[in-house]
């Protein structure tokens, strides 16, 4: 007989259990913390050597074992400290596509007490320059393409550069990974505490520039442990998974999202480090390539954004490949259409649909749902397991009654410390240890969370957060633009795409093509509006003077405003 959800949480996190919770204090706030969590991530990386000759990373035709990865991590740690002079608390930026070197760089940086700055590999030169300046990075580890984009910034800021997989001769003073990595060197060690900073992940900014979300070692480890505990809690509380038809296979992950995103970094990559699991790395998303890798590598866990699940099950090549190894298909980053839940369940023989509602600011952890629970609650994002707590609050920050709508707030040891160099944004987002999500929703009597709308002016495009203010800031740099309002336009595959309505200055002209050419060098491609409306009259505003973006969106959807498409 299954337990209630509360009983399962109590049993899994009780005294004597691996996931035992005890009273603790984090940044002056009392909360439950994991008794048996490692003190810092360096212990996880050092411990991974114990997995020895087990396969860790698979990339194209390359196979790297845990022991081989550990040797390279130790060598890079030595290089960072002994050659580049990296000290505890220094920021080291990583900017590259999904390569094995990203994984090893992350581990080496954090294990010497430095802070890993994860840079979006789709950024333009201007965006990359801002993050290097804002973070105060002293070293950049990057691939060839990111070096070409950021080289001038590094020269200007006197940043040391290490290039992986260089495709052409490098300028004097720029190091090549394969030539300078001192294999055989021992790890220099570091004195690291649980509440020391470990990572900075940049999120799109609500006021024009990205914000660096800072996580401590404790926060990241709390998230990893909470993910592990949650699986047991769900099964003990009655969530039924499919009976496997066929042989059991070892748990493994396919990396289909960028490592600079929290999903790729924490629940996927770091889970493999902790549990000694295989991680098959995709350079970029391609559904047929993913199907081929799933069959060849016998992948069990497919964790991405709903767009990728949609691509997978709708691929014309789906029936060509054996996907019977899959046990979990889904992820987070955006709400999932209810039709997709059923389609994944029907098409993936042994795979269970799943959804997680996490954020960069929660280290990807949050309410989640899978298996029979998801099929019976397809519009919910699930329930939060301990030590996370969820509340729905009104505009006065007071909890609302069950079933009523309000803003969703999170609490727990997995939350970020705050935003780098942004005490204003930190104070606005984190109040008495509780983090505001920016999403509107409700909780039902059984604790299921339902996300209904957004407080934030944000578009979710294929799992990427795009803030209207950031895109508008770039658009307003064009001299012809008088007014600009950015909004989301529904899209079957992407969830949403970016739209904009523009009024040009008197006596000036601007075509959509001219706008696209202007923005191509200003902001990352995924932020550039693909639906552009050039208005002949001022944009609609409310009594407070704010643009009526939902009204503009509806006009574009209905076709009463004609948008040029890219």
Predicted segments, located by residue:
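Structural core segment of the AMP-binding/adenylate-forming
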Residues: 1-17, 111-179, 506-508
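ANL superfamily adenylate-forming
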Residues: 22-24, 61, 145-194, 209, ...
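Conserved AMP-binding/adenylate-forming core of the ANL superfamily
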Residues: 33-37, 53-87, 91-99, 103-107, ...
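Conserved AMP-binding A3 loop
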Residues: 65-67, 198-226
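AMP-binding/adenylate-forming catalytic core of the ANL superfamily
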Residues: 123, 129, 140-142, 302, ...
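Conserved pre-ATP/AMP-binding loop-to-beta segment of ANL
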Residues: 184-202, 208-209, 239, 244-252
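Gly/Ser/Thr-rich phosphate-binding loop
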Residues: 274-277, 296-304, 313-376, 389, ...
